[in-house]
Amino acid sequence: MSTKGKVIKCKAAIAWEAGKPLSIEEVEVAPPKAHEVRVQIIAASVCRSDTYVINPAFKEGLLPVILGHECAGIVESVGPGVNNFKPGDKVIPLYVPHCRKCKFCQSPLTNFCTKFSEHKNPIIEQELMDDKTSRFTCKGKSIYHFLGISAFSQYTVVKDINLAKIDDDANLKRVCLIGCGFSTGYGAAINDAKVTPGSTCAVFGLGGVGLSAVIGCKTAGASRIIAVDINSDKFAKAKALGATDCLNPRELNKPVQDVIVEMTNGGVDFAIDCAGGSEVMKATVDCTTVGWGSCTFVGVNVNDKGLTISPVELILGRTLRGSSFGGWDVDTVPKLVSDYKNGKFNLEALVTHTLPFEKINEALDLLKQGKSIRTILIY
């Protein structure tokens, strides 16, 4: 029986309160409206960004909410005006929209879109659809969306400009990682930092994003990749993916940036911060060489005050830039999927656990405890 145009009842993990476990509930998912697509989620992964809104220290989050944004699925139905998707298409929802019409979409300099850049904080400002209503209801109460995706539901509704259509034979249980973590780190290295062959690099933070940045540096031909994390258990994985050296700041007798400068005769060519926080941001800057050192910032910490920097550090030739989703968009993500299929990079190494969707709280605990890189949730 067709579900097109009808409300779908399904299971979703709802965050009712900050600091509390998610609750598996039956939700009602409304049909897609104009330029919207309803997607059946097949597989998703847990990203640290999913935990920000339910962190008691984060005061701006809107609850109740269905979290999740790193996923892949199949189109169930489309709303009026949707011409580039049809039921049965395999897709990856993206938190970065791409309208193809605005000045950002038409520029080769960014993957931003007016629909994205108008948000001061996209983590909390894509909580409703364009008509300022939600497509989710539970127990008669409207439930907020998250990053325009809400992957922790068996069905979700997203805007068509937030969807990438991918190959029919794509393995959704792996390419779901391309929805955020892998693309963010890998692209930060090859698209935004533009790591060059023979260069030296430092990567701070060895979660899914940081390890993907290591893969990106290796793919770009870096001769030395220094991986930094306070969890030494991640070093074996980092070296397997291309890191030449690993440093734990807690095991050093001087600041890690000073050690890196000594190791590289003056500092690395490229440094990528995938951890966030003022201390790590400062170390990222300080570990790069004067003259041409490149600093790329990817990581975000809840309520962190950010970086304070002297103009002299910039006058000496360093460049600083931010990176969002690694420079990819809905038009370039399909090529990433093809590259994975053709063996250009390995997503398997990032997957440490696979769990049924109902065990989502276990997946979140593994992430918080530093025991997982990426846990795949199977719906």
From Swiss-Prot:
Lineage summary: Eukaryota, Metazoa, Chordata, Craniata, Vertebrata
Family per record: Belongs to the zinc-containing alcohol dehydrogenase family. Class-II subfamily.
Catalytic activity: a primary alcohol + NAD(+) = an aldehyde + NADH + H(+); a secondary alcohol + NAD(+) = a ketone + NADH + H(+)
Cross-referenced Gene3D superfamilies: Medium-chain alcohol dehydrogenases, catalytic domain, NAD(P)-binding Rossmann-like Domain
Protein's UniProt keywords contain NAD: yes
Cofactor note: Binds 2 Zn(2+) ions per subunit.
Pfam families: ADH_N, ADH_zinc_N
Highest rank taxon of the organism: Eukaryota
Residues where Zn(2+) 1 binds: 47, 69, 176
GO BP terms in the entry: formaldehyde catabolic process
Localization terms from the record: Cytoplasm
InterPro entries documented for this protein: ADH-like_C (IPR013149), ADH-like_N (IPR013154), ADH_Zn_CS (IPR002328), GroES-like_sf (IPR011032), NAD(P)-bd_dom_sf (IPR036291), PKS_ER (IPR020843)
Cofactor or coenzyme needed: Zn(2+)
EC number: 1.1.1.1
Entry's Gene Ontology cellular component terms: cytosol
Keyword terms, alphabetized: Cytoplasm, Metal-binding, NAD, Oxidoreductase, Zinc
Name of the featured protein: Alcohol dehydrogenase class-2 isozyme 2
Binding site for NAD(+): 205-210, 229, 234, 298-300, 374
Binding positions for Zn(2+) 2 per the UniProt entry: 99, 102, 105, 113
Cross-referenced CDD domains: alcohol_DH_class_I_II_IV
Subunit structure: Homodimer.
GO molecular function, one term: alcohol dehydrogenase (NAD+) activity
